[in-house]
Structures are given as C-alpha cells and as structure tokens.
C-alpha cells in the first residue's frame, strides 16, 4: 500500500434540479444516479459524459425518496403526494403508481430480490408491497409519529424504521413482530443504513450525532459527534469499514469504523447536505443537497492506509497549529480519539467543479394520463400503455 494512498477527489459536478435534492441512489451498474427533489421531479443522471439525462415529472408534490430495483430495470420514487411511482428507465416513462398511504410517503426501498417494495409515510406506518402482483403484503404501524425512513436488511428478513417518535424499530418480515426498539432521548432519527453484513445499523440523528447499533445484541457500538448540525443521511461503504454522512452543517464526513475516528471532512455544498450514497463497488460516492447540487466523488478508499493517514493528518495538524489555527475537537465513541485529525477537502477550486457540462442535456419525460385512484383500496397501480412524451 505504500505510495498508493490517495484522498477522495471530486469527479463530476451536476446541476439541473430547481429545488433541493432530497435523496439519491446509484444504479446497480454504477453508470447512473437517480435523484429526487423538492421540485417534484426525479432525474436519472448518466455518468457517461456523452449520454443524456432524463427528468421524470409525474409527481404533483415534492419527491422525498428514490430507489433502484436490484436489476436496475425499475426506479421507484416516494412523493409528498402520497404516491409511489414506478419508472422504467429504458421506456423513459411511468409504468405504474402505488397510492400507498394516506399521507406523504417519505422513503421507498426494494428488497434484495426486487420482488418486494417497502414504503414509509407520515401516516405513522411502513408497508411492504409485492411489486409484480401489485399487492399489499403487510404493514408495520407501532410508530406514534411520522416514519421518515424504512429499509430492508441485506438478506430481506428484517425491516428497520426511523420515526419522529424518537424510535428506531426492527421488525421481522415474516411474522410482522417488532423484535428490537432503540429509543432516542435527544432527537428523532432522520435516516438509517444497514451494514453490508446485516448485523449493524447506522442512525443519523437530529441532535448532530451518528450512532451504530448491534442489531442482534441491542447494544450501542459506536457514537460519533462529528457534525455541528443535524445529520441527514448515512451510508456504509460496501466493505463495511467506512461510513459516509451528510449534515445541515453543509459538510460530508467519512468515518473509519475500524479505528473509530473521522478521517475526512469534505466541503463544497453551500447548503445542507441531504443525501449521500456509495456506488455498489465503493469506487465512487455521491452527495446531494438543498443547494440543488449533485457532487460525484472518487472515493479512493481502496487505497486507504491507516498508518499513512496518521502521518498525513498529524502533519496537517502541525501546520495548522504553527499558523495559529487550533485543531477541532469532537466527541466520539468509546473507541474513537478525542482529536479530530480529519483531512479537510474543498473541491470548489477544482477543475471538476468549475467545468461546464458541454454534453449535458436533460430530456423531460411526462405522461399525459393521470393514474386513477380507486377508493376503498389500500393501493392503486395503473399501467400506462402509451408512449411518454418528450419536451
């Protein structure tokens, strides 16, 4: 590893939404990113510079969440209009709609097979749906307030929910029973992420903290206070060794979970960072914020070496002290160091940030027919047979 250690670096900079980005997800092949926005649209961004991007604008209210099916043939979006739209990227149109909840839908997720879909809502429930058969399967409704996020575990046997009642609950998919409850005292959880092994859960909290729990043992494993404002999103690196976070303080942090410490502080957003995600191979990560920007980064975490980082961060800290700048202090878990020796990276002067996207073009894809709502049903799914219109 000697000599190969490289810091994360900005690769691409996209703007195109007219409202803040609320969530983002890489496609399974890593060539596309789906973003949802308060401007009521979803955009599929192509990382191939010569390829066009597609904007879907079928929601009638802000879009709160987005997810890819495991095969990449479907994209689901969760709207404040109480619906979940199912998009087929190859057809560039809406293939169906779930009228899934009685209030705003906050998040959407697919299980590892792609057969089941999970939704979370302000109606205090999370629901599982069978995608192909368009059937409601089950509901988890023990929350006493909005459910901001719901995620399948990697093996699909458990569901985790984050609610404004200041709880994180773990449900057994087969039985529907709540098997674990983690209660917060300071603030409600805003987002959560399963560890790739399925045995741990990271929780982003409104009290500026990040917690990592052992799901089976109900134990708090690590606590990080590395942000100065509420934490909006967290994502595990596929290796499980690193955690990415985004906050209202406009920064992105990368944590080394093996050493229990923050290692990078990334700036570049000019407003709250609402969404973070790694690509499936971990080579890239993306961040999106209220400033409407989508930043795509080379993670370079495969080159990370703890000993080289220690030397580099110590040198940076020494330089700061010699220039009269004190190192920032941060609370951490029982395994983390008190001094935040993370390396700060600001990409706003980089070529990748300043370059205009000469080949960038967004195609608007709208469908002329509004799906019908069937009263008395928990769900309505209407297929559209005609071709979408392009503007």
From Swiss-Prot:
Pfam families: WD40. Residues 321-338 have a biased composition (Low complexity). WD repeats lie at residues 16-55, 58-97, 100-139, 142-183, 185-223, 226-265, 268-307. One of its GO terms (cellular component) is ciliary basal body. Keywords: Repeat, WD repeat. One of its GO terms (biological process) is cilium assembly. SUPFAM superfamilies: WD40 repeat-like (SSF50978). PROSITE patterns: WD_REPEATS_1, WD_REPEATS_2, WD_REPEATS_REGION. Residues 321-341, 363-391 are annotated as: Disordered. Plays an important role in centriole formation. Belongs to the WD repeat POC1 family. This is POC1 centriolar protein homolog. It comes from Drosophila melanogaster (Fruit fly).
């Amino acid at each position: 590893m000697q000599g190969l250690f490289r810091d994360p670096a900005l690769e691409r900079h996209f703007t195109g939404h007219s409202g803040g980005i609320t969530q983002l997800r890489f496609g399974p092949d890593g060539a596309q990113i789906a973003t949802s926005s308060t401007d009521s649209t979803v955009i599929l961004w192509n990382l191939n510079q010569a390829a066009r991007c597609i904007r879907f604008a079928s929601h009638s209210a802000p879009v709160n969440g987005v997810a890819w099916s495991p095969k990449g043939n479907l994209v689901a979006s969760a709207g404040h209009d109480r619906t979940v739209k199912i998009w087929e990227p190859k057809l560039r149109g809406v293939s169906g709609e779930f009228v899934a909840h009685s209030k705003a839908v906050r998040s959407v997720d697919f299980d590892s097979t792609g057969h089941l879909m999970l939704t979370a809502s302000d109606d205090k429930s999370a629901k599982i749906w069978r995608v192909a058969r368009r059937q409601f399967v089950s509901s988890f409704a023990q929350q006493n307030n909005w459910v901001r996020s719901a995620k399948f575990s990697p093996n699909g046997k458990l569901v985790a929910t984050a609610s404004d009642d200041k709880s994180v609950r773990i449900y057994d998919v087969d039985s529907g029973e709540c098997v674990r409850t983690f209660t917060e005292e300071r603030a409600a959880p805003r987002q959560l992420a399963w560890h790739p092994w399925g045995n741990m859960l990271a929780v982003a909290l409104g009290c500026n903290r990040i917690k990592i729990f052992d799901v089976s043992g109900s134990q708090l494993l690590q606590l990080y206070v590395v942000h100065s404002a509420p934490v909006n999103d967290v994502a595990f690196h596929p290796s499980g060794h690193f955690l990415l976070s985004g906050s209202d303080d406009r920064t992105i942090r990368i944590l080394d979970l093996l050493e229990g410490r923050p290692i990078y502080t990334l700036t570049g957003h000019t407003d709250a960072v609402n969404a973070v995600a790694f690509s499936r191979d971990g080579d890239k990560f993306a961040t999106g914020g209220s400033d409407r920007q989508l930043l795509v980064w080379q993670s370079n975490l495969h080159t990370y070496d703890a000993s080289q980082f220690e030397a580099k961060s110590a040198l940076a800290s020494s330089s700061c002290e010699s220039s009269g700048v004190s190192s920032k202090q941060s609370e951490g878990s029982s395994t983390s160091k008190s001094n935040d020796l993370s390396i700060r990276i600001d990409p706003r002067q980089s070529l990748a940030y300043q370059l205009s996207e000469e080949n960038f073009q967004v195609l608007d894809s709208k469908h002329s027919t509004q799906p019908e709502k069937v009263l008395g049903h928990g769900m309505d799914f209407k297929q559209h047979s005609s071709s979408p219109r392009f503007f």
